[in-house]
């Protein structure tokens, strides 16, 4: 029974990493679609939503089966709990990617505008957070997860700066209002992806160290 339980834990880890790869790819495709005004990539992101939702359900079912199989030791219980929470955050990352793709589809219908926002730079930072959060899970390294927490403030500042700049641009040139609003929503979605990456990092620290570092409390050694 114990061997089957550990096989289940390995399967749970593998499925979550697969889902993480899908969610990360969806964000990268959506932001590349913005950069290239690529409708084909937008549709690919929309098409990926069902697959991400399906694997989310599979992970939840497997996690519940493992909890019912036997009473896990503390570290295994923390692992399963963390996986279920990370699973929910990854599904929401996929949702944000869909939101970005939909905004890009709106933007492509409009004339290009010179907007005071660097979406590719913000996207690169956010994608890096998601990637590092997943690496911290794969390697069970709280130090990697802590680096993600520090990056969240950087993205928040980018989002705040984008808001101010885009609102000013709309006042100066009302003709670009819709383009600016779409870009503003994309920035907000990216900021939410960063929040989910932060949640994932916090869950990894909880699993590895048994420490609750939500609200950016310092994690004990």
What residue ranges belong to the model's regions?
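Cytosolic, long alpha-helical scaffolding segments
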Residues: 1-221
């Amino acid at each position: 029974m114990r061997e089957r339980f550990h096989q289940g834990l390995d399967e749970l880890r593998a499925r979550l990493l697969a889902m993480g790869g899908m969610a990360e790819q969806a964000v990268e495709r959506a932001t590349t679609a913005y950069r290239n005004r690529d409708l084909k990539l937008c549709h690919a992101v929309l098409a990926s939503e069902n697959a991400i939702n399906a694997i989310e359900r599979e992970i939840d079912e497997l996690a519940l089966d493992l909890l019912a199989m036997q009473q896990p030791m503390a570290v295994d219980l923390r692992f399963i709990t963390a996986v279920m929470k990370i699973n929910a955050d990854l599904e929401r990352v996929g949702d944000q990617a869909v939101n970005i793709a939909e905004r890009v589809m709106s933007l492509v219908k409009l004339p290009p505008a010179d907007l005071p926002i660097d979406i590719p730079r913000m996207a690169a930072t956010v994608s890096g957070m998601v990637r590092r959060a997943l690496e911290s899970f794969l390697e069970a390294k709280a130090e990697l997860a802590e680096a993600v927490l520090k990056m969240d403030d950087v993205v928040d500042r980018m989002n705040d700066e984008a808001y101010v700049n885009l609102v000013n641009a709309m006042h100066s040139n009302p003709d670009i209002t819709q383009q600016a609003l779409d870009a503003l929503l994309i920035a907000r979605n990216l900021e939410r992806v960063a929040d989910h990456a932060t949640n994932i990092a916090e869950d990894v620290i909880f699993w590895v160290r048994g420490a609750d570092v939500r609200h950016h409390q310092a994690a004990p050694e």
